[in-house]
């Protein structure tokens, strides 16, 4: 799917993506930021211009949420909020906007709920479900299971206690999360327009933990 050649919002692109999965049972949708390589006046943007590569990256992250994290397009974006937050990945942004669902008790939450916690990926969520059958988990256990505690600590409790005394407030959590530098692909950091690898799914997955 070409990104930035026309005026579609991220929400519209994500709706189309969701529709392709549901109606045509596609296994994967790919995105590519539009790059104008000549000065043809019929092209939508000038040579050398193009959408931020971070936008393409956010679409891949949201696509991952649709395919593996049981999200729906309308939960990630909406008509009132049609474009991605450039500061936070889609999963983290969703959590910040739905703090009424947090903190989550990791020793009691079901798999679906764990998937929505920033810092918990589907592998670590599966490990949590299996491990807690043997007893209650603590934060050290979670760290060993691959939970990214520097992100998750604002959204979870272990045996009713948070890792640190912290406020469950959007502004407070957002400020602290901004201090945790997001790991972005080199191409995005450089803000050039070389297309990301269609087969590098590890990067998208790691950023949704």
Please annotate each region the language model reported.
Residues 1-10, 32-37, 45-53:
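Conserved strand-turn element in the central/C-terminal portion of the radical SAM core barrel
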Residues 34-39, 75-90:
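A glycine-rich phosphate-binding loop feature that marks nucleotide/adenosyl-phosphate handling sites
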Residues 83-113, 139-209:
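C-terminal extensions
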Residues 131-132:
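Residue-level signature of tetratricopeptide-repeat
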């Amino acid at each position: 799917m070409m990104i930035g050649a026309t005026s579609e919002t991220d929400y519209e692109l994500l709706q189309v993506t969701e529709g392709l999965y549901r109606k045509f049972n596609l296994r994967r949708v790919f995105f590519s930021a539009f790059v104008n390589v000549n000065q043809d006046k019929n092209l939508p943007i000038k040579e050398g211009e193009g959408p931020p590569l971070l936008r393409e990256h956010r679409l891949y992250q949201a696509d991952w949420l649709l395919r593996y994290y049981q999200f729906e397009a309308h939960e990630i974006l909406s008509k009132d909020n049609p474009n991605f937050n450039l500061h936070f990945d889609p999963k983290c942004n969703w959590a910040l906007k739905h703090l009424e669902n947090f903190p989550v008790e990791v020793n009691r939450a079901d798999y679906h709920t764990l998937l929505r916690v920033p810092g918990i990926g589907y592998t670590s969520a599966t490990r949590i479900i299996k491990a807690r059958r043997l007893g209650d988990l603590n934060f050290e256990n979670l760290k060993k299971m691959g939970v990214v505690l520097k992100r998750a600590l604002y959204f979870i409790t272990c045996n009713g206690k948070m890792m640190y005394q912290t406020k469950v407030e959007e502004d407070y959590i957002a400020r602290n999360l901004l201090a945790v530098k997001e790991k972005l692909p080199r191409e995005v950091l450089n803000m050039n327009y070389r297309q990301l690898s269609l087969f590098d799914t590890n990067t998208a997955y790691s950023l949704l933990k």
